[in-house]
Amino acid sequence: MSNIIKQLEEEQLKQNVPSFRPGDTLEVKVWVVEGAKRRLQAFEGVVIAIRNRGLHSAFTLRKVSNGTGVERVFQTHSPVIDSITVKRKGAVRKAKLYYLRERSGKSARIKERLGA
């Protein structure tokens, strides 16, 4: 029984997901439905958390928009996601960057990972 479920989940996994780590800056293009129209909306932010659970994998992006912190959780293999692009690689030493929520300005910056 579990082999059938595992096989169905493997068929639904996306193959074009780039590798990224916490601290990286990503641009995620998402399909948004407004009435009868369908359009792409971009969300660019820093990865503050990754949850690896096969088909149920997710990652959290954080950006500051007009002085307000905005966080959004994306399901990695969701059909709503059109593309994921790595804009910048960040050098951090923790897996979860929740401490960025309390920081602002220069202390919220992340160094760039060199040689990656």
Curated annotation (Swiss-Prot):
Q: Which InterPro entries match?
A: Ribosomal_bL19, Ribosomal_bL19_CS, Ribosomal_bL19_sf, Translation_prot_SH3-like_sf
Please, which domain of life does this record's source organism belong to? Bacteria
Any GO molecular function: structural constituent of ribosome
What are the protein's UniProt keywords? Ribonucleoprotein, Ribosomal protein
GO biological process, alphabetically ordered = translation
User: Quick one: a GO cellular component term?
Assistant: cytosolic large ribosomal subunit
Keyword flag Acetylation: no
Q: What family is it from?
A: Belongs to the bacterial ribosomal protein bL19 family.
Q: What does this protein do?
A: This protein is located at the 30S-50S ribosomal subunit interface and may play a role in the structure and function of the aminoacyl-tRNA binding site.
Q: Tell me what this protein is called.
A: Large ribosomal subunit protein bL19
Q: Which gene encodes it?
A: rplS
